[in-house]
Amino acid sequence: MKVSIFKTLYFQVLTAITIGVLLGHFYPEIGAQMKPLGDGFVKLIKMIIAPVIFCTVVTGIAGMESMKAVGRTGAIALLYFEIVSTLALLIGLVVVNVAQPGVGMNIDPATLDAKAVALYAEQASQQGIIPFLLDIIPGSVVGAFASGNILQVLLFAVLFGFALHRLGEKGQLIFNVIESFSRVIFGVINMIMRLAPLGAFGAMAFTIGKYGVGSLVQLGQLILCFYLTCILFVVLVLGTIAKFNGFNIFKFIRYIKEELLIVLGTSSSESVLPRMLDKMENAGCKKSVVGLVIPTGYSFNLDGTSIYLTMAAVFIAQATNTHMDIMHQVTLLVVLLLSSKGAAGVTGSGFIVLAATISAVGHLPLAGLALILGIDRFMSEARALTNLVGNGVATIVVAKWCKQLDNDQLQAVLSNKVLPNVKSSVSVS
């Protein structure tokens, strides 16, 4: 039976975003008051992320035949993340140098309001590779779940999955309980996702109402340049990777169109993390691969954020007439290879990492951040959308390289064929 287009989440979210834009533009004061709707939806999603990751990773690892496969999957995923995110940084650097969106603005850093970015600068001072690595280890298991820290929950889930696997048949009861709990959690997600149009409406109405279309026009060249670069990256880089791994990037984008629209409305790729776990498994990727690649990718494979970081940093230099020779840009690239891994798939994290990078490089005026503070929210959409597509592609590629991909299933879902929703039953090896 064909579902009416009016009942699809895709149509409802698209309609909600359109209404949000109109409300924010024509009635900005009312639009700015819609923020709680978007925040509330994102908080509901965050509430469920930790248990979803735990259940997915534990059942995925515990159900594998060999623990060597888990280590191999993790190593391949990290190698892929490093290569592709480095490509994203380089592409952003090349485009911003060619397009030069900041040249001619002639901004004096002394005239900028440094107070506007003081909070971000303070948060940036806490960034660093050692604190980042130590932060992956939770102070307590309960604390990891309470704070919703993705990497902390992932670490505990991996260890728990290994331990459960070693129990063999003795751990079967625990495995069954967690798998049943996982079904309940995904049932909760289905209920929450009914509110996605409301969340997208509130977030978009607030963005347009508070910042206005005028802020888009003022720095439109940078925004346009960034959006085009993200499209270029998705079509050429991710498209080429997809082609060499046997699937079409445009068919994949169509497959996750509902998730992309939710991200467009909320500006956070984290808002669809639970749905992506389910969708990638439905696309033929083994649960063990999905459970490792998707959550890890939310910190280590943020392609859109990587493009944004290089473009924004060089744009500030161009706008303030700060000279950046080749060595300065190489230094910037090296710093970003480390600092970009500290970003998360949440709104605003990219701006904090940018502040940390500028502080670390030392050559750029920190006050220059005030130039893009007003438009960062608009650039956040492109970052989040590119991040989401990038992590989806990464999951399929890693699954294929690890021989954990059902290619027939993948081609069927990408071709929009209806398949029986059969969950294969697995047991603790």
Curated annotation (Swiss-Prot):
GO cellular component labels: plasma membrane
Pfam families assigned: SDF (PF00375)
Keywords per UniProt: Cell inner membrane, Cell membrane, Membrane, Symport, Transmembrane, Transmembrane helix, Transport
Membrane-protein topology: Multi-pass membrane protein
Annotated transmembrane regions: 5-27, 47-64, 77-99, 141-163, 184-206, 216-238, 330-347, 351-373
Function statement: Responsible for the transport of dicarboxylates such as succinate, fumarate, and malate from the periplasm across the membrane.
Name of the protein in question: C4-dicarboxylate transport protein
Organism: Yersinia pestis
